[in-house]
Amino acid sequence: SPARIDKAFTWENPMSAHGLMHMVISNAFAKDPYEIDTLFLYMANMAWNSSMNTQSTVEMLTAKNSDGDYKIKNIIYSDSYSSEMVAYADLILPDTTYLERYDCISLLDRPIGEPDLIADAIRWPVVKPDRDVRGFQSVLIDLGHRLSLPGFITEEGKPAYSDYEDYMKKHERKPGIGPLAGFRGLDGKSNGRGSPNQ
């Protein structure tokens, strides 16, 4: 049976490079391919602009079983803005805006390099948050540590990364290959900012 709730990369949907986000709520509602306990969404305003059918999506988000429980039991939602999806969430994790957080598009995500060179894109914060928010990636890293997930804890059980900025700089899948391989410098030891373009 499919491993993903959106059935991406199955014989039904073999061409799914970016996933099938528009299928997540309807599949969770139908318990197809399996039942889930919690739907965790990030900046995906599925109640409005990504659903292709707003009325049907809202009905699925509010539908209840005969025992009175919601068919989609728990919804956790993280966003920088109070989108339509917030109204249906049981837990809301306020996120930073793109001006307030570190972020990257790396070789491990959607490569933006060329065949003969590696390249990364980095987002560097330009303002500090003026409210009680945390970057979603940092929240996930914290959850990874709290759940003792491999790769997020040290051998001593301590957090492997303090936040997403730390993760971007230190994480490597293989020597020299991590979220910011292009920002490690010629010696492979630098991080965060590369040398000026020549």
Regions found by a protein language model. Give the residues of each.
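Non-catalytic, alpha-helical, charged scaffold/linker segments
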Residues: 156-167, 182-198
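Non-catalytic alpha/beta scaffold blocks inside enzyme catalytic domains
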Residues: 2-178
